[in-house]
């Protein structure tokens, strides 16, 4: 059965740019690799990387760069950013890994140019509480210690796959986003080959479930590259945003087809 999506109503250039910026952020669900400075089995599986993606939205192309590093405090710093015409963005997620789970510390999104919007999440202000900046207002959200941000949520999936790939058919993650908490559910569709600028890549295909029938999100992860994301497609109101990997380094080595 073919899904059908209604076309959005006409909007102003500023509103279109704002929606495009938000779609790009939604597309960048991820955050994609770690370096663990701590010792142990899970630390050895997590490695730093830099990845370049070609992102296409409404006929426009832009390059998006993601980078994952670790500091001397055993914190992981994941950055994400790109620019198209008069719209740009930069994101940073800071977290640590404890007991095979990501523990969020902070998240900041900064829009630039026409859409100068800022969002923040702070997970360590007080025990059991997240402070969130959304549309120039601060909100308090409950935290159970495992709440993620919209960037590092994909890292939790990767982490579990790296530890036991046979056990992750689907996963539900608790996400703090704006003034609310929500559950993000990812379901394994199967194994697929994706054709990229690097050549054909064997991947695992996951679908993100949405309550809204006008939204659809799919991601493809490469097991041979520590489950690095090689493709993502997000559709909202019939308008797709697609990201495809064009190049990457993993633990300082250029990735290549094996």
Task: Please place each PLM-identified region on the residue numbering.
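Bacterial N-terminal signal peptides that target proteins for export
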Residues: 5-24
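Hydrophobic, well-structured mid-protein blocks that either form specific transmembrane helices
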Residues: 117-162
């Amino acid at each position: 059965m073919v899904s059908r999506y209604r076309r959005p109503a006409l909007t102003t250039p500023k509103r279109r740019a704002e929606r495009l910026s938000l779609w790009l952020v939604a597309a960048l669900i991820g955050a994609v690799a770690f370096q663990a400075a701590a010792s142990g089995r899970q630390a050895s599986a997590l490695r730093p990387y830099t990845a370049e993606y070609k992102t296409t939205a409404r006929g426009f192309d832009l390059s998006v760069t993601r980078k994952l590093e670790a500091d001397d405090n055993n914190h992981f710093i994941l950055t994400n950013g790109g620019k198209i015409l008069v719209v740009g963005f930069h994101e940073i997620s800071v977290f640590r890994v404890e007991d095979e789970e990501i523990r969020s510390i902070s998240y900041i999104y900064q829009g630039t140019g026409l859409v100068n919007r800022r969002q923040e999440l702070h997970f360590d202000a007080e025990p059991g509480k997240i402070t969130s900046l959304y549309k120039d207002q601060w909100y308090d959200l409950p935290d159970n210690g495992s709440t993620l941000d919209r960037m590092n949520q994909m890292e939790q999936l990767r982490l579990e796959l790296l530890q036991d790939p046979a056990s992750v058919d689907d996963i539900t993650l608790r996400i703090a986003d704006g003034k609310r908490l929500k559950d993000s559910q990812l379901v394994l569709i199967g194994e697929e080959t994706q054709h990229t600028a690097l050549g054909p890549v064997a991947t695992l295909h996951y679908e993100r479930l949405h309550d809204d029938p006008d939204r659809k999100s799919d991601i493809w992860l490469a097991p041979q590259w520590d489950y690095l994301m090689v493709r993502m497609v997000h559709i909202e109101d019939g308008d797709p945003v697609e990201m495809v990997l064009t190049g990457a380094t993993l633990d300082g080595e250029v990735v290549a087809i094996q």
